[in-house]
Structures are given as C-alpha cells and as structure tokens.
C-alpha cells in the first residue's frame, strides 16, 4: 500500500516514500514529483487502460503486480525493477531461490493477455455500476469513489470525505 502524496507536508525529504500510481487512495493516475527517494508501486496498472505513468526522477524501485488486474489474488506474483541491486533480492537471485512456478505464471499471463485486457473487458460494467450507485468512475475498472456518508468507513484519508469502493462484488454477483 503506497503512501499518498496529497498531504505533502507529511513527507520527510530524507526518508523513502512509497507511492502507488495508479493511487491506492482512489484508483486514479496522478502526476507525481517529490524531492525524497521513491519506491513506485504500480500494482493497479493491469486494471487500467494504457497510459503514460509519471515516474519521479528519484525513483529507485518500481513494482508491478499481477494480482489485482488479472485476478491472481493470493498468488503474490509481481516484478520489481531497481536502479541498483536490491540487497535481499540479489542474494536470493545468486542462489536461484525464487518461485519458478510463479515466474512461469507471470510469463504465461504476459504472453496471453494485453496489459489493458481486463480494463477493456470490464470498463462498461464499471460505468453501469457507477451510474446505478451514483459513484465516480476510477481509472481502475473495479474501483469507484463516492462522498456518500454511508461509505465513510471506506475512506482512505481522514482529511478527505472521499471513499474508495471496490465494485468487483457487483461483477461477481451478476447484478449488472
């Protein structure tokens, strides 16, 4: 889960900032530039259309997940790109200590699905759900936002009355 930058006064310029883009806060892409070191979490990329991602210049690592967009929840499959060797991951690589089955699954997903395939398949349903429930559409096909007080427990930021709502249950139940 990335730290959101809507509250820039919380950022310590000497500490690494974890940022999710698209944002874990609302599932939308953000233009981001901060002066501290950054680890960029692109977990939601496979649940959006293809867009240019703003990568802060001082980003040291970028993560991608196959869990959310491709429905591989619990598999813990992802990729990490680093500017410098990662101390722990580099050591594991030297001993060939990684999940070969997971690597094969990632390879199969990448060969058989476009990165925006799930977004293209489900975007119209997301729009229908958002219209029916008076939600605001997110860049991620299974997320929406609302300021409806009923959803106050879903708020991700105490200083904001916007709630992030996962709409995937409505897909599963065939409500729409």
Task: Pin down the residues of each PLM region.
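PLP-dependent class I/II
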Residues: 1-176
